[in-house]
Amino acid sequence: MSSYFVNSFSGRYPNGPDYQLLNYGSGSSLSGSYRDPAAMHTGSYGYNYNGMDLSVNRSSASSSHFGAVGESSRAFPASAQEPRFRQATSSCSLSSPESLPCTNGDSHGAKPSASSPSDQATPASSSANFTEIDEASASSEPEEAASQLSSPSLARAQPEPMATSTAAPEGQTPQIFPWMRKLHISHDMTGPDGKRARTAYTRYQTLELEKEFHFNRYLTRRRRIEIAHALCLSERQIKIWFQNRRMKWKKDNKLKSMSLATAGSAFQP
């Protein structure tokens, strides 16, 4: 990453030593030697080495050696981040790393940098302190506002589930039509003598089975599966129903033929 960073930078800008890279180190090397970003020509490099926009104000860019990278990476949501940067610039007017007069130093709990030479020796650490405090306070303010906005909405939303819960039992009981009721109702699956209870069919199921039997008294397995899916029955139930229906049909035809035979013999001379 670092080699790609240096090579791309030196290829784009021939006078690379004029633009020294910032010092990314630990906290101990925070006050080390680094080039002031405010002293660099902002008009000559509008974009960073890898294409990020670095055209920011001098006061915010010189706040800390993390300021240039952090603000340029956050440059695309400009509307959401502008109040945070404005607060940072208004709290500390940083003209150069040597003199750091802070107007709101007491409010942030830090000393003015012009008080002692030891404070002047560490300008980067104090300026980083201010920006971090500003960012923390700016990020906490929207969270508090969001929590205050969400609390009344939650209070309003609480009565609604109660209303829906009262209406839920009414909606859970569907309307039962007469053709949906079973003709032979037996809640237990065993009959009075311990045998399996008679299968109860609804009027709709019986009507559909009677229509199918009217067209064809014998079913193929494919047609039986289709009827089972359509009527929410099992193949075994449909097979047994057709067997019983054929027996009934045979009995009816036998009685009809016998009655016709007796009627015909009665009219014989």
From Swiss-Prot:
PROSITE patterns per record: ANTENNAPEDIA, HOMEOBOX_1, HOMEOBOX_2
Subcellular location: Nucleus
Comp. bias intervals (Polar residues): 113-130, 163-173
Residue interval(s) of motif Antp-type hexapeptide: 176-181
BP GO annotations: anterior/posterior pattern specification; embryonic skeletal system development; embryonic skeletal system morphogenesis; endothelial cell differentiation; positive regulation of transcription by RNA polymerase II; regulation of DNA-templated transcription
Keywords: Developmental protein, DNA-binding, Homeobox, Nucleus, Transcription, Transcription regulation
DNA-binding region: 194-253
InterPro entries linked: Antp_homeobox (IPR050296), HD (IPR001356), HD_metazoa (IPR020479), Homeobox_antennapedia (IPR017995), Homeobox_Antennapedia_CS (IPR001827), Homeobox_CS (IPR017970), Homeodomain-like_sf (IPR009057)
Tissue localization of expression: Expressed in a broad spectrum of tissues.
PANTHER family: HOMEOBOX PROTEIN HOX, HOMEOBOX PROTEIN HOX-B5
Similarity-based family: Belongs to the Antp homeobox family.
Protein name in UniProt: Homeobox protein Hox-B5
Classification of source organism: Eukaryota, Metazoa, Chordata, Craniata, Vertebrata
Gene from which this protein is expressed: Hoxb5
